[in-house]
């Protein structure tokens, strides 16, 4: 944990997780690859977990480029995200522009 603190990763992740909790309570998120791809037109932007597979990263990056959406890789793992959303996922669409801006400025 101390090595993570020295790299600044824990504070960014904590801020991200707190904001994700707010997004969830506001009903402004879509989770999981298939659901995100289906609703990508509604998304302000897409977040991915730091431990998402390279294959999934490439696939979601393709869809983001195709639909002109911003893709942000967080410092949070899927397990950390699961702790907030109660669902293990590595791909999250944020449907609110203000909330996505708040999340993406950490990176």
Regions found by a protein language model. Give the residues of each.
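Short alpha-helical
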Residues: 54-55, 98
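Short secondary-structure boundary segments
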Residues: 50-51, 75, 96
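Positively charged, polar, low-complexity stretches
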Residues: 22, 33-38, 55-81
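Short, compositionally biased "basic patch" segments
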Residues: 1-14
């Amino acid at each position: 944990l101390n090595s993570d603190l020295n790299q600044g990763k824990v504070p960014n992740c904590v801020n991200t997780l707190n904001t994700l909790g707010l997004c969830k309570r506001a009903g402004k998120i879509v989770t999981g690859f298939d659901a995100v791809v289906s609703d990508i037109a509604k998304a302000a932007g897409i977040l991915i977990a730091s431990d998402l597979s390279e294959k999934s990263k490439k696939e979601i990056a393709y869809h983001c480029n195709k639909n002109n959406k911003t893709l942000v890789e967080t410092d949070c793992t899927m397990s950390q995200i699961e702790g907030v959303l109660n669902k293990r996922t590595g791909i999250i669409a944020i449907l609110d522009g203000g909330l996505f801006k708040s999340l993406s400025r950490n990176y």
